[in-house]
Amino acid sequence: ALGFQSMAYAGLETGVTDRTSYVVVQDKIRLVFTTPMPGENNEIFDHIKKHGDGVKVIALWVDDAKKAWEETTSRGAESYFEPRTEEDKDGKMVKSGIKIYGDTVHIFIERKNYNGTFMPGFEKWESHYNPESIGLKYIDHMVANVGWNEMNIWEKFYNETMGFANLITFDDKDISTQYTALMSKVMTNGNGRIKFPINEPAEGKKKSQIEEYLDFYDGPGVQHIAVATDDIVRTVSLMKERGVEFLYVPGTYYDTVGDRVGEIAEDMAILKKHGILVDRDDEGYLLQIFTKPLTDRPTLFFEIIQRKGAQSFGKGNFKALFESIEAEQERRGTL
């Protein structure tokens, strides 16, 4: 449905006995899907039992995995595993890891001396089913949901431990309805390529969507993965043809979007037809749409985003997403 191609496989046939992993690729995006095998690797099994399907690892490509680990742990990060070298006939790769919110981890990947398909332990996976790409280019950002009063803790972590800066802040006056609210801070690295928004619940009359996530995921974790496209209308059209369902956007959203956003290149009627949101920052505008949760638990979902100059995020779309998820909460009886 999302147009990814088969890339690599690790499992019994490749000498890996405790898990099976499939790697799929689309342009610069690599996703690894892993399931445990019977045996000694209880970490994967325990993660799935506790959280359901979700994001365990956010991998970061670095020039020096040993230095990245030494620097972050010296600044207070808790180690997930120390630097180690893995190699096969295609070269060597250095990896290290640190723990972040909940049971999520960052793994630092140094692959300058590796020329294989993916990494040691994996072999090329050739599938008979390779659907047409839908135009996804790269991961634009990944959003964390953390617990009460934890947003500033993780802002400080990314700032002081990882060297990130705060790009923009949304408070409970920006993102709220008559029932619920949230607060969010967006952290970004030096070149702006990596963006990690961090959400926490805010006081409201009813249970917010962040609280719902924390209940069903059983703790903090990745709320959604935003993937970029150069043609959001084409991408969304193909996804809908393949059965992907998106969050409903009330038609009234489009009554005022022109006044708020100004002139754009896209046909507003087509955007309304597909439920694509539009917002603007000081540098341009962006278009966004959000899938429904990927599993029965109302946790992880995807965002499709197209940036037309905008480097940050607009408050209008964030609020519209918040309201759409709140409507789904009401349907589920968890508001």
Question: What do the PLM-derived regions correspond to, one by one?
Answer:
Residues 1-57, 64:
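A generic N-terminal leader/anchor concept
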Residues 2-4, 75-79, 160-164:
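Amphipathic alpha-helical scaffolding segments
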Residues 5-10, 165-170, 246:
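Short, well-structured beta-strand/strand-turn elements
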Residues 18, 54, 92, 181, ...:
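Exposed loop/turn and edge beta-strand positions of beta-sandwich/beta-sheet ligand-binding modules
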Residues 25-36, 57-146, 150-151, 156-157, ...:
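Vicinal oxygen chelate
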Residues 50-51, 133-137, 215-219:
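Short, flexible turn/loop "capping" segments at secondary-structure junctions
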Residues 142, 158-164, 219-221:
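Long hydrophobic segments that form regular secondary structure
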Residues 221-232:
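C-terminal, well-structured subdomains that either form a transmembrane helix-short loop-helix hairpin
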